[in-house]
């Protein structure tokens, strides 16, 4: 911890979905880190351990009928999963929360804001419609904060530029895809850390109902390592790769495509194949990171 200039806060016991870990919480520059012990684990997925409940089976059957798929559920799911393998993961300090990339919080009277009266004119229009936020794509974002507004300026970055800035500014890096799978699933053999399907009692992003108001989002709560990870398929978490590589989400493709909760959240499985992109352009609204 001293080597990375981390300040020890406390020991804490995390427990979730049948796995638990007592470990140290640390702080650096306003960020919370947790010490994740290493382990030798099995990663990847090829078949059900518990099997799906009736609700998940019916949801899949409806989609199979729609796309005229005649194979088994396991065959269908296996196509998008990494192969089963044994991996040894080294211990690491891990940022507890997902963070946005390329957004700089600035005061409303920042000269870079006031130099654009058209932004403020548009903001006034939106404010009049009782809107909570207003964004100009990859340029600026405003969010209501009580009676006032907060502003962020966007600084688009490429994947290599971001990796360099992470190293220089935080002395940190991105987790590898295998490390990410371990942080997310802890070596679980089921499709998700809690079982072989979606628990429909959970409050999920993009599938809320009236009864959920005021409740926390279940998947966003700290897992057995104390991490908030893979809880929103619209968020793609950057991992280490030769070109831009992400885990934990698909930018909302399945949800937006009307595939329903189960397939919508499948990209959040710890076993899902990482998405490798050729362009190296970070999409500020969707791509997020955690330092390790």
What annotation goes with each model-predicted range?
Residues 47-51, 56-58, 107-109, 189, ...:
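Surface-exposed beta-strand edges and their flanking turn/coil or helix-capping segments
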């Amino acid at each position: 911890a001293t080597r990375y200039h981390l300040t020890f806060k406390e020991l804490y016991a995390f427990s979730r979905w049948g796995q638990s870990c007592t470990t140290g919480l640390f702080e650096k520059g306003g960020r919370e880190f947790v010490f994740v012990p290493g382990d030798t684990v099995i990663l990847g997925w090829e078949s059900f351990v518990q099997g799906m409940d009736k609700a998940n089976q019916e949801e899949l059957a409806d989609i199979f009928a729609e796309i005229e798929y005649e194979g088994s559920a396991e065959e269908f799911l296996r196509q998008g999963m990494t192969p089963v393998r044994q991996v040894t993961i080294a211990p690491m300090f891990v940022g507890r929360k997902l963070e946005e990339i390329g957004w700089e919080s600035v005061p409303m009277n920042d000269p870079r804001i006031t130099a654009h009266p058209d932004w403020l004119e548009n903001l006034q229009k939106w404010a009049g419609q009782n809107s909570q936020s207003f964004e100009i794509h990859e340029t600026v974002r405003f969010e209501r904060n009580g009676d006032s507004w907060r502003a962020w300026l966007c600084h688009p970055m490429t994947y290599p530029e971001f990796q360099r800035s992470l190293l220089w500014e935080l002395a940190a890096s991105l987790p590898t895809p295998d490390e990410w799978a371990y942080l997310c699933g802890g070596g679980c053999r089921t499709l998700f850390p809690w079982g072989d399907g979606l628990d429909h009692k959970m409050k999920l992003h993009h599938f809320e109902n009236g009864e959920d108001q005021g409740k926390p989002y279940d998947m966003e709560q700290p897992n057995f390592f104390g991490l908030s990870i893979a809880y929103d398929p619209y968020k793609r978490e950057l991992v280490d790769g030769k070109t831009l590589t992400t885990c934990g989400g698909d930018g909302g493709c399945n949800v937006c495509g009307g595939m329903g909760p189960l397939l919508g959240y499948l990209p959040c499985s710890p076993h899902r194949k990482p998405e490798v992109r050729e362009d190296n352009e970070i999409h500020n609204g969707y791509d997020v990171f955690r330092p390790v």
